[in-house]
């Protein structure tokens, strides 16, 4: 199993030339082959950046995706109303005055309207390219299956999927097939991103799910069973499980600690590494870590991707030592609270800020664990 003491969630800031090329491709001004050349070059560069920073775990920065969760609808037919706001909707908040709050409406036509038909893999090609360009641990991120629960609509989806459970069964099957293929290709570390669980600490988001007929306890139980069905499809593979509170354009969705969800999630999910958000007071304290089973590692997301603030090795080590009062030091790691760019709309920091933060994580891990 992967035991690295330095990790980052996955997404990295897209360089301006890649974003410009994506826009030109969408406008029909750039041939797909030329875009692929630019995209491949950007991925090679971001791999080199992580290696130079000392990262033992590397990703492709999610550079080939519109959003961390967009590959399901990009690779599988059957959805309608999908645009960038499908991944950005919600009431977003910021602690920085110049960023401010923002509300993005859910696309009104967003729904599954046909039976799912897989056209290509979600991440197998990403992994193959990544593995061929690094000798570090190559990590692939995938969305938790129940992130897509909101795409089932009792009216618009009923012809394709009269029952919600039937839709979710197909989503789970797609993701199970994907992790099996990743495992076959040699992937040793995959991560499920599950930001929808911490949303349940917020009354408004609880009401959203309860309006669909689920109590919080029922929803957590259902979701964890779905996650475990995906994780259990690839025995021997290390799985990370990332839990944050929303991260987009340096904004967040909810505030509060993990207290209300820690027992069912930390103890119930079959993941080997829990990547948790702990970069500010909004994230709550370390007390819920006492509920982490002894066979799991915790990646403390102490380094923020939302602001340029330069964390120091001293402060990070102090917080790691504090967490070690609840979880054995050897089962801890240090990382980011979330990605640097969970969609093509990245956080409001510079590429230099990103590099410095990755270097600080690697140096801190070396200082604490050797």
Located regions from the model:
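Domain-level signal for soluble alpha/beta catalytic cores
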Residues: 1-370
